[in-house]
Amino acid sequence: QPPTPPEHRFPGLM
């Protein structure tokens, strides 16, 4: 699986 961007790993961060 491709590395997921931080904004996808931590919803609400952006």
Curated annotation (Swiss-Prot):
Tissues in which the UniProt entry reports expression: Expressed by the venom gland.
Methionine amide PTM positions: M14
Cellular component aspect of the GO annotation: extracellular region
Highest taxon of source: Eukaryota
Subcellular location: Secreted
Protein keywords: Amidation, Secreted
Protein name in the entry: Tachykinin-like peptide-I
